[in-house]
């Protein structure tokens, strides 16, 4: 079970969050609470819960762990390899500021080249190798078990691309809402998508910022609200 963290203020402020430690906002906490409630109501069976070590994932994981503990003795582990992509010098910056202060880097970013990244940050290839390697490692360590993994939008994008056999170039092609349920099966050398972007438990909450990479290349560019 893969979960993207709940909403933060930086999602709303349209910043590259990257690996900056940003906490959940009030909506994000409510998303996490509803997610935990749904897992408890569905009596989801899980053996381990793993999150990235950033605060927004740990805060999302906390109520989820509480919902699962009455059923099973599971532990809460953190793994820094599940962090969001490192955007280097632009971590924490608004898109307009990146365009103004790093125009060449921004132009390269809009090409979505796998071997390119923001100054001082990871390339998409490096990011993909890190996060898919981490998930395959966890799957091998806990073979035959169900894991709940709380991570980031960019990580889930890499999972989707891998499962669908897509390359790393080009804009994102999947919806990755905050605190949605995504169910996958990891096999040696492959990932199967079972269910994706299930947000039934979030009905009635404010509309989420949408990370539409296809609009980034348009006039003005719509900023990435998730990463």
Predicted regions and their residues:
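Short glycine/proline- and acidic residue-enriched helix-loop micro-motifs
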Residues: 105-126, 217-224
């Amino acid at each position: 079970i893969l979960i993207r963290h709940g909403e933060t203020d930086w999602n709303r402020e349209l910043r590259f969050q990257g690996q900056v430690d940003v906490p959940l906002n009030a909506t994000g906490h409510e998303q996490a609470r509803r997610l935990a409630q749904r897992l408890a109501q569905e009596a989801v069976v899980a053996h381990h819960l793993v999150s990235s070590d950033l605060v927004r994932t740990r805060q999302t994981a906390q109520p989820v762990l509480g919902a699962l503990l009455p059923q099973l003795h599971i532990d809460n582990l953190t793994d820094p390899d599940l962090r969001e992509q490192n955007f280097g010098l632009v971590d924490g910056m608004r898109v307009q500021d990146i365009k103004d202060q790093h125009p060449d880097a921004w132009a390269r970013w809009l090409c979505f080249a796998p071997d390119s990244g923001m100054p001082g940050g990871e390339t998409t290839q490096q990011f993909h190798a890190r996060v898919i390697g981490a998930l395959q490692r966890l799957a091998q360590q806990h073979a035959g078990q169900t894991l709940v993994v709380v991570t980031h939008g960019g990580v889930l994008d890499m999972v989707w691309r891998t499962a669908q056999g897509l390359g790393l170039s080009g804009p994102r092609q999947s919806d990755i809402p905050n605190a949605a349920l995504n169910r996958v099966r990891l096999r040696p050398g492959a990932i199967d998508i079972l269910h994706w972007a299930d947000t039934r438990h979030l009905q009635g909450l404010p509309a989420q910022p949408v990370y539409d990479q296809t609009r980034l290349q348009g006039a003005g560019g719509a900023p990435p609200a998730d990463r």
